[in-house]
């Protein structure tokens, strides 16, 4: 296992997203996903609110409700929809999605539960090193299993479970640079 020799980082303290309706956000994250609301803050000068939810293992996901936040733009500020159905692109500097770790032994149960509750979910993706990067069925080369869904504001969320431990052999690709990008031209 790799160790950070420079800083003693202990994971993600929180991710902060922006919502349009804090009550709807509470209803989804606490009501649908079962995450306890653990801290609420009123921002100064009537700027808005900042609420935190416990998403397990001491990690939190937070939301700003800002009185003057612009509306999100699907495909720019976040992906337009679920993987396999819509474009997965989002703008440079944006958050593409949040993946919550779930126990591998409960993954299929959770997927079925989402479907039973009528939550729109992607098909299960079994991520691997094949040319397409995913398969419909798990196999020995699968390194993570996941499914995707969206919150009420369109943020792309994922339930994921690791299925193997990585080694140095898993780091094989040369990093791309800004020069490799194909930036769309505005009309």
Identify the role of each PLM range.
Residues 1-7:
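A detector for short, charged/polar N-terminal pre-domain segments
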Residues 10, 22-23, 80-152, 175-187:
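Vicinal oxygen chelate
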Residues 18-71:
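Core segments of cupin and vicinal oxygen chelate
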Residues 43-44, 127-129, 163:
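Conserved beta-strand edge residues that scaffold enzyme active sites
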Residues 54-59, 74-83, 89:
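Active-site-adjacent scaffolding segments
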Residues 72-75, 164-178:
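A short, polar/charged loop-to-alpha-helix boundary motif
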Residues 155:
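Conserved Rossmann-like nucleotide-cofactor binding loop
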